[in-house]
Amino acid sequence: MKCGNREIFVKTQESTNPEWGKPPSKRTTEEYIRYSLVLIDKPRGPSSHEVAAWVKKILGVERAGHAGTLDPKVSGVLPIAVAEGTKALLALSRSDKVYVAVAKFHGDVDEEKLKAVLNEFQGVIYQKPPLRSSVKRQLRTRHVYSLELLELDGRYAVIKMHVEAGTYARKLIHDIGEVLGVGANMRELRRIAVSCYTEDETVALQDVADAYYIWRRYGDDTYLRRVLLPIEEIARHLPKIWVRDSAVDALCNGAPLAAPGVVKFETPFSKGELVAFFTLKDELIGFGRALVESEEAKKMERGLVARVDRVIMRRGTYPPMWKRKQQT
């Protein structure tokens, strides 16, 4: 997981017009809600869809969506984007996950042998979705970044697993038991991280309800702004490209980003990598794929740097200067 600590390469010094757009912290409460992300600590019991529906109802918005479905029996980090922010869920669609699982082996297990088998499962593995899965049951590869034995007590083991999106933890535990020759099943599972977002940053549904009530009843949105994150936070793990005011509306209309529109960007990024576009007021414009590597982008005076795949910002937030240039 790439979580910050990237270097910023500044191509040119540029200012931004205060009359257009606004920094996320300056949004009205209503705007802040509509472009927000909330990290819910999902309890065991309800489905991910039910939790998202509750957030939608609490905040009085027409839609809310979640990233990375958790089964009803699984608890932990569930990112939920609100209203206009749901368009930004693309940023988390392929994010890796970290789980802590309680496994029960069907026979006695030697600790050193278990550690050796866990080590064997690190890297690229093959998995077929379980029978109850909602996706097509075909063999596919998934990357297991790390498996760590936290505790072994008799036939019960606590295992921390950092895996690629779409990895079935229950199937992974089953396969580990098969290799050990004793069999195993998963008794409990908790997701402790999605990409750069950890369980330490999560809030309960009651926190969302309380924060919204305090704002509506007393006009104080301080608590609400702590519980909800600006949607810009959803791009925390992605390389960022900041653009001139004159390039913003063109991106909002789906035009690719050309080199003259780039002010600065985070490095490194590779060709084809998902990147996030930002204004000089740190507003999220949208997402796209880099058409060149960051080292090449540093030298470019003309040509295309990235394409646009998803637009978050409303058209017209910045004036359409690109149309004026086309007409002159």
Curated annotation (Swiss-Prot):
UniProt enzyme class: isomerase
Gene Ontology biological process terms, A to Z: box H/ACA sno(s)RNA 3'-end processing; mRNA pseudouridine synthesis; rRNA pseudouridine synthesis; snRNA pseudouridine synthesis; tRNA pseudouridine synthesis
EC number: 5.4.99.25
Catalyses which reaction(s): uridine(55) in tRNA = pseudouridine(55) in tRNA
Domain PUA: 238-313
Active site: 71 (nucleophile)
Keyword Isomerase assigned: yes
Signal peptide start and end residues: none
NCBIfam families to which the protein is assigned, alphabetical: CBF5 (TIGR00425), PRK04270.1 (NF003280), unchar_dom_2 (TIGR00451)
Protein purpose: Could be responsible for synthesis of pseudouridine from uracil-55 in the psi GC loop of transfer RNAs.
Protein name per Swiss-Prot or TrEMBL: Probable tRNA pseudouridine synthase B
Species of provenance: Pyrobaculum islandicum (strain DSM 4184 / JCM 9189 / GEO3)
Lineage, opening ranks: Archaea, Thermoproteota, Thermoprotei, Thermoproteales, Thermoproteaceae
Gene label: truB
